[in-house]
């Protein structure tokens, strides 16, 4: 039996209608849907009734599956010849660990495609009417983690404040007082 294929799909930043048409189409034709808790659950309804649905959690402080286990699920299901959609909140490559997932797929010789999602780093300010770049005001945007894997602030946070661009912090609520103090 030949390997299936994995589609790593960004679900966008909240509402189900912010997913791309391509992402929705892949969900409609999948055999297995591996999804995070951060997605809009309405997206699950796009999958065929026969599709296997696997929730792998991924909420701040409540990771129901370790990343290594998620990688194994993707590889195992694809080796069964199935079409797998890995549905991730936001964009898979903006603090979404999509890079780790494609490394596992490459190591296992599993074919994959990536469907970008709308990242909250751009969409949230935009929906609030705040441009992340603006002619003559902000010529760049910097997306920074609000905490590292060791649950600390990034070491270069003070240098970030010296840029002439817009700073966007993701996953920083718990460290917000420290972030503000260091800027």
Each language-model region and where it sits:
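Class I S-adenosyl-L-methionine
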Residues: 1-16, 21-118, 123
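Beta-strand/loop-alpha-helix module characteristic of Rossmann-like adenine-cofactor folds
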Residues: 2-6, 112-113, 119-183
